[in-house]
UniProtKB/Swiss-Prot annotation:
Positions bound to substrate: T342, Q372, R484, W486
Pathway: Glycan metabolism; pectin degradation; 2-dehydro-3-deoxy-D-gluconate from pectin: step 1/5
Organism of provenance: Arabidopsis thaliana (Mouse-ear cress)
This protein's record includes keyword Cell wall biogenesis/degradation: yes
Entry protein name: Probable pectinesterase/pectinesterase inhibitor 7
Catalysed conversion reaction: [(1->4)-alpha-D-galacturonosyl methyl ester](n) + n H2O = [(1->4)-alpha-D-galacturonosyl](n) + n methanol + n H(+)
Stored Gene3D superfamilies: Invertase/pectin methylesterase inhibitor family protein, Single-stranded right-handed beta-helix, Pectin lyase-like
Amino acid sequence: MESPIFILITLSFFLQSVLASSQTLSNSSTICKTTPDPKYCKSVFPHSQGNVQQYGCFSIRKSLSQSRKFIRTVDRYIKRNAHLSQPAVIRALQDCRFLAGLTMDYLLTSFETVNDTSAKTSFKPLSFPKADDIQTLLSAALTNEQTCLEGLTTAASYSATWTVRTGVALPLVNDTKLLGVSLALFTKGWVPKKKKRAGFAWAQPRSGSSTHTKPFRLFRNGALPLKMTEKTKAVYESLSRRKLADGDSNGDGDDGSMVLISDIVTVSQDGTGNFTNITAAVAAAPNNTDGSAGFFLIYVTAGIYEEYISIAKNKRYMMMIGDGINQTVVTGNRSVVDGWTTFNSATFAVTAPNFVAVNITFRNTAGPEKHQAVALRSGADFSIFYSCSFEAYQDTLYTHSLRQFYRECDVYGTVDFIFGNAAVVFQNCNLYPRKPMPNQFNAITAQGRSDPNQNTGTSIQNCTIKPADDLVSSNYTVKTYLGRPWKEYSRTVYMQSYIDGFVEPVGWREWNGDFALSTLYYAEYNNTGPGSNTTNRVTWPGYHVINSTDAANFTVTGLFIEADWIWKTGVPYTSGLIS
């Protein structure tokens, strides 16, 4: 039975359709033509006229209601099947419960925002950044539901008699369709038209700005301009063995570019810190901070930390700094072969917004024979990884959702080793395909954009793509590709990067026959190196060699609209194309 508030929203839908004379009124058949599934869309709405904003509010609210129902269903199945001998089944349901909770948060924020724009007689447009925020949340909500569905489908194959397929997975299919409708109507009704061009993100230019900019800090120095109290500073200096001068900002002084630290705890395996493991330090961090007092810093000294760490959504504004790549190492060995879902195989997982990691190695040692085994998964909005390394084989780095930035990082893997559906930029990184099992190939990326209205994609800018040492010395031939389309609207761009000659001349590989070859968006711009020649590249309809105008859509300010969240961390970045 629908809640009273949902009934109220439904009545409001009819009243607003009468009063909104300043908006273009249409019936559901007309409105639904703009959605991915018009037939399903028409089955959702009342048979009355309204404008796209009213239909959008209605569908987002209904998505929220369905999300609540789904959580109750999952809870019931977890309780009912707690005795099952197949751990993958329970883990898939637990993933779904976790993801559904996040989806509810995203939908509630989205509904409150769009509902505030719809007055009785007029419509108030959203700013460019606010529209991008909501499109990002709806895109992530859709990704969450599809991640759940994939996990359930895989888990259900373990038992032919298990009812999860009909009891949980099938209802979720319709919920996913409804979210696609909500995202499509939001994109049509609220996202500025210029931003919607070809589904690209668009950045409103700042005064005097250019699409070509220079990085403002040195490549790979791994140090941030931190500002902290004398007490906190003494703790940091004693462990890091790095003296922080007053106004430590490369000589710039405290000009607003310093990174404010609210407090610090330390992790050291020899007992000289506050904690001997990272998990305990994370638990000690404050909950739901707004960042106004700065970042909560966890300093992790050198050591091999065999832990599975999850940074929950309430641990906002956390910064974790290690002693360097291959010095501070977080390692695990979970894999799909051993009964974990891909989602929860991650050694390190982060959901909390505004998370920053510096000078840390994240590793999964399961090995190529264990197939999917994630080193790090990020579904954290505004998450940043600076001077870190990620080491595994298949599915090393899961850039799951929301907005992410990687600077001066090393990523090692084999099959689909950078995958997911975030809006993510890799800058000045090193991507190292390594030796897979015999008869396997390497695919650097497997981007998971499943809907044309998702503002997601993978941008690889000013990076170096070279073979890892074990691939160079391999005693059998291995083919390496820039990527393959995991989902129908997969979107990946390589630009201004060095591509070594070991990459196959065709560049890209099919996923399965002609799947997604017309709907994907793969592009290359101004790359160098013996593997960058596009003469013999694939001839798919979705593959492009682009110019600087199109490439600018995949820079930091193109994909993210605003970059203040990066600037406030002190992490260096290039906002546009490199001159």
